[in-house]
Amino acid sequence: MIDAEGFRANVGIVICNNQGQVFWARRYGQHSWQFPQGGVDDGETPEQTMYRELHEEVGLRPEDVEIVASSKHWLRYKLPKRLIRRDSSPVCIGQKQKWFLLKLRCKDEDVNLLKTHHPEFDDWRWVSYWYPVRQVVSFKRDVYRRVMKEFAPFAMPFNKREQQKDHWRNKR
């Protein structure tokens, strides 16, 4: 779905582990790394798209994660001119993205990048929370900075958050 301004509706996915690290994946056959993301199909909600992309790109199911937060607004980035396909109609000049912060509830071994015949990624690793902002391709950097800043209050190491909940439960 491309809007009247030429932006394709898309979701981005930040997956955190209990240590507050984030899932960072290498694009298949390339040297670039990014968060999972994908386009919204006609009739899909952003949440439905997120779960579909999570399964297609990372091999995880809804029960493998917990939604912690979603971005308040759609965040946009423009594609560099060299990446715009002028022969398609309508012409897509960039992405507008709704972002989701997920907590991983399964084992690392459950991640399967080869769920589809055309995998998006060929490797992945856990990285520190702010690492992607400096490492993503330059045209996505502002969106990554904005979404990571928005999610930061929710993304402190989850094990510490759960310890705090237990601490306050025991004080009552």
Swiss-Prot record:
Keywords: Hydrolase. It is an enzyme of class 3 (hydrolase). One of its GO terms (molecular function) is mRNA 5'-diphosphatase activity. One of its GO terms (cellular component) is cytoplasm. Residues 6-149 form the Nudix hydrolase domain. Its cofactor is a divalent metal cation. GO terms for biological process: mRNA catabolic process. Belongs to the Nudix hydrolase family. RppH subfamily. This is RNA pyrophosphohydrolase. It comes from Pseudoalteromonas translucida (strain TAC 125). The gene is rppH.
